[in-house]
Amino acid sequence: MSFMEEALKEAYKAKEKLEVPVGAVIVKEGKIIAKAHNLRETLKSPLAHAEILAIDKASKIIGDWRLSGCELYVTLEPCVMCAGAIIQSRISKVHIGTFDPKAGACGTAADILNHPYLDSFVEVSWEYNEECSKVLIDFFKDRRNK
């Protein structure tokens, strides 16, 4: 199973909890060290995005806030808040499953990860996955029909 498929499993966990279905995994040296999914509604926190929760878990597991050499796999393009956390945690590479035309901050609506005024560079890999899009489309279609 690919790392993006693992992130998708996390997205489906979020969907089961009626959370926006976004999942994330952090990989170091070819092994998953943290997994998370959106929990904003569950935790009543605007900060409980999958990426933020995965970064927090990974930092605790390795005992350092610096996640240099780690890679993040996420089903939806990170927002500005999450892009900022990615930069601050020094994640080396982000693999993105689908675009977010409204709030994506990794090249779609904005490009925070490689902004010329920031002293950082995060490699971005667009790994379009139809299922990453489909889970979001289906989730919002179901919400509108209720």
Question: What is each of the regions a protein language model found here?
Answer:
Residues R40, V74, T98:
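Residues that line or immediately flank small-molecule/substrate-binding pockets and catalytic motifs
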Residues L18-V22, S68:
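Short, basic and Ser/Thr-rich N-terminal targeting/leader segments
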Residues L47-A48, I52-I87:
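Helix-adjacent hinge/juxtasegments
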Residues M1-K17, E29, P78-K146:
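Zinc-dependent deaminase
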Residues V20, E41-H49, E77, E127:
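Residues at secondary-structure transition points
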Residues A7, A11-A14, A24, A34, ...:
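Small-residue (primarily alanine) positions within well-ordered alpha-helices
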Residues V22-G30:
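Short beta-strand scaffold segments in enzyme catalytic cores
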Residues I33-R40:
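Short beta->alpha transition motifs characteristic of CBS
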